[in-house]
Amino acid sequence: MLRGNNIKKVNSLLVRSFHSTVGNRSGGPSTPINYPSLEIENAGEKQKMNLFQAINNGMDIAMQKDSKAVVFGEDVGFGGVFRCTVGLRDKYGASRVFNTPLCEQGIAGFAIGLAAQGATPIAEIQFADYIFPAFDQIVNEAAKYRYRSGGQFDCGSLTIRSPYGAVGHGGHYHSQSPESYFGHTPGLKVVIPSTPIEAKGLLLASIREKDPVIFFEPKLMYRSAVEEVPIGDYEIPLGKARIVKEGKDITIIGWGAQMRVLLQAVNMAEEKLGISCELIDLRTIQPWDVETVVESVKKTGRVVISHEAPKTGGWAAEISATIQERCFLHLEAPIQRVCGYDTPFPLIFEKFYVPDHLKNFESIKKTMVY
Amino acid sequence: MLSNFLKVNSKALGHIRTFASKSGEIKHNFKKADTYLCDGPSDSTVTNKDELISFFTEMSRFRRLETVCDGLYKKKLIRGFCHLYTGQEAVCAGLESAITKDDHIITAYRDHTYMLSRGATPEEIFAELLMKETGCSKGKGGSMHMFTKNFYGGNGIVGAQCPLGAGIAFAQKYNKTGNVCLAMYGDGAANQGQLFEAFNMASLWKLPVIFICENNKYGMGTSQKRSTAGHDFYTRGHYVAGLKVDGMDVFAVKEAGKYAAEWCRAGNGPIILEMDTYRYVGHSMSDPGITYRTREEVNHVRQTRDPIENIRQIILDNKIATEDQLAAIEETVRDEMEKASEKAIAAPLPQARELFTNVYLQEVPVRGVEFVNSFKP
């Protein structure tokens, strides 16, 4: 169910040289990790872009095609701290691309009001860790506007973008993964892309989505993830997972920056143990693609789910619960969750904390011999 | 030499007027504070040799601390987020001299110098930045998570510390300690809603809290002019009295601090001090600091308003010490910071189990990937 008429095929796979130069942040090799990106056909010519450039390109297209689209947030006027909005003010003017004061609650509330008037606000919260002052506006106002007015009002055109996740040395307030807080809130959609191509297509779909979307961007990959991104307009539908790699023995589920770590673990498991892994990129956290996951688990009978956020109450818990409801008699082993520890995100201990490829490899191994 | 490096033009510091008397007392005039709902302190003070040398030494220590941090960051020994105080030293030094060590301070993330002024050692500050076991927070927090006696951090979320300051002040009132709390924030944080919630509570309950807006003109990369309606932060409390102070003159800061502390101790409730100051460096280490302002602007402030050069000039004009003697002080400071950073670099990393400690009061099991691999206290 594709809304972008430029896409013929989304699920076809093509291995591209999408790689990271900081691959050893979790103890792995520093050599580039090839990550299979998807192929977008008929979206025009391609250009080498990293993740922030792909997001910039996506916003550029959104603003060009939708004269009501506006971009705002802290320091976005001169390009934003991660350069995602660079050049947009020059192109679309200071009345459509502007800096806000440092007031996250105000930014979110302002964006909701603007959306209720039919504009297309694309608000930036500078770090996902700073989204909590805006939590009330997002959870109580944005998520419930349509419901509590019986459909008279909504802020469906709202998109809030925010960089999330480990970055190497971010410490307590620049590293968190808050997707579960928002996934727990009916009325919101939560999206996390894993590659530049994905980021552009998912962002365009999120901006045009008629329900409020929280779009978390893996900041570790802003510069390190580079691939040939189509420069045309295309969308990747929300709520659809991507099977990155087909396999028969075990299902591995992740999203965002974790996909690269999981691919590394999967490659290790295949090379060292001959295990055939099916790797799924969830893409949308809420509503998540239950059917794709269930279908895969029914085939493999074994599951590992991995995210950076703490284990308890993380989104892997929701996925696990659903899998046991839907696939109980198909399961050959307990579902494994490879996640962050139940501690604040640490500074010095980041390497211990993150669910790296070795922890995932161990988990795959254990699950296979259960 | 720092003075050569800065190319300080003594004529540019012409607004400082001092008069030495035979008793060794030196009268110093400064720009009178703008006032709101209060009379404010006078525009002059009397100082002496000891105080001048002490301010010179303290502020040189503050600046040197940050210079060493900058160097360690560039060597990639300090990682992550790091915000330097360079240029704003007079605010910290002046306020600390206006209160006692029993009073309380809470600030935002530009906190290294407050640690030093509160009495922490340079070594524990560097060690925290270097994520070492001997750091003030056991190396667990880093730059923006520093704490010591009567200093409540070191807070990374913009504006979040201000309501905490009101709570700390309430405890002083309730327990009749006679102490005050300084709640510091920047011009960027001045637009956070929770600051106004704190103003209201503090005023309603007449809490002994001094809200201090360190207005360094830029909230990250956004000029105050582009982020803030009305440019007077000291009047923004509406029903809260305020002063706008020359935050580059340590004596102006000290007198305003004393006035505010007396105001609070007399039971008048909160007061706001807006410190007209400036940071020479970028917002954080990744900000070169010249994309949203000109190099000329930064240099102009350095040459005309530098708080340390300001004091140096008073000392030299009044023949309290020679240039060589001041250079010797700077050398001692340099040596102190150098030794402290070397010790911090040599200190061990925290034990791995520290990942799991201090999550709750009691150490609790922390789930790992598999139950058997979980942490058990």
UniProtKB/Swiss-Prot annotation, chain A:
Positions bound to thiamine diphosphate: Y130
Enzyme class name: oxidoreductase
Gene Ontology CC terms, in alphabetical order: branched-chain alpha-ketoacid dehydrogenase complex; mitochondrial matrix
Organelle targeting sequence: 1-25
Catalytic activity as recorded in UniProt: N(6)-[(R)-lipoyl]-L-lysyl-[protein] + 3-methyl-2-oxobutanoate + H(+) = N(6)-[(R)-S(8)-2-methylpropanoyldihydrolipoyl]-L-lysyl-[protein] + CO2
GO biological process, any: response to nutrient
Pfam entry (one): Transket_pyr
Keywords: Metal-binding, Mitochondrion, Oxidoreductase, Potassium, Transit peptide
Keyword field contains Magnesium: no
Record localization: Mitochondrion matrix
Gene Ontology molecular function terms on file: 3-methyl-2-oxobutanoate dehydrogenase (2-methylpropanoyl-transferring) activity; metal ion binding
Cofactor dependency: thiamine diphosphate
Record-listed E.C. numbers: 1.2.4.4
InterPro entries: THDP-binding, Transketo_C/PFOR_II, Transketolase-like_Pyr-bd, Transketolase_C
Record flagged with keyword Ligase: no
Residue sites binding K(+) per the record: G156, L158, T159, E209
Record function comment: The branched-chain alpha-keto dehydrogenase complex catalyzes the overall conversion of alpha-keto acids to acyl-CoA and CO(2). It contains multiple copies of three enzymatic components: branched-chain alpha-keto acid decarboxylase (E1), lipoamide acyltransferase (E2) and lipoamide dehydrogenase (E3).
Oligomeric form and interacting partners: Heterotetramer of 2 alpha and 2 beta chains.
Protein known as: 2-oxoisovalerate dehydrogenase subunit beta, mitochondrial
From Swiss-Prot, chain B:
Residues binding Mg(2+), per UniProt: D187, N216, Y218
Xref: Pfam families: E1_dh
SUPFAM superfamilies in the record: Thiamin diphosphate-binding fold (THDP-binding) (SSF52518)
Activity regulation details: E1 activity is regulated by phosphorylation (inactivation) and dephosphorylation (activation) of the alpha subunit.
Entry's localization field: Mitochondrion matrix
Gene3D superfamilies on file: 3.40.50.970
Positions that bind pyruvate: H83, Y109, R110, G156, V158, D187, G188, A189, N216, Y218
Function: The pyruvate dehydrogenase complex catalyzes the overall conversion of pyruvate to acetyl-CoA and CO(2). It contains multiple copies of three enzymatic components: pyruvate dehydrogenase (E1), dihydrolipoamide acetyltransferase (E2) and lipoamide dehydrogenase (E3).
EC number of this enzyme: 1.2.4.1
Metal-binding in keyword set: yes
Name this polypeptide is given: Pyruvate dehydrogenase E1 component subunit alpha, mitochondrial
Subunit structure: Tetramer of 2 alpha and 2 beta subunits.
Any one annotated GO CC term: pyruvate dehydrogenase complex
GO molecular function, one term: metal ion binding
Organism encoding this protein: Dictyostelium discoideum
Superkingdom per UniProt: Eukaryota
InterPro entries: DH_E1, PDH_E1_Alpha_Subunit, Pyrv_DH_E1_asu_subgrp-y, THDP-binding
Enzyme class: oxidoreductase
Cofactor: thiamine diphosphate; Mg(2+)
Keyword Kinase found: no
Keywords: Magnesium, Metal-binding, Mitochondrion, Oxidoreductase, Pyruvate, Thiamine pyrophosphate, Transit peptide
Transit peptide: 1-26
Reaction equations catalysed: N(6)-[(R)-lipoyl]-L-lysyl-[protein] + pyruvate + H(+) = N(6)-[(R)-S(8)-acetyldihydrolipoyl]-L-lysyl-[protein] + CO2
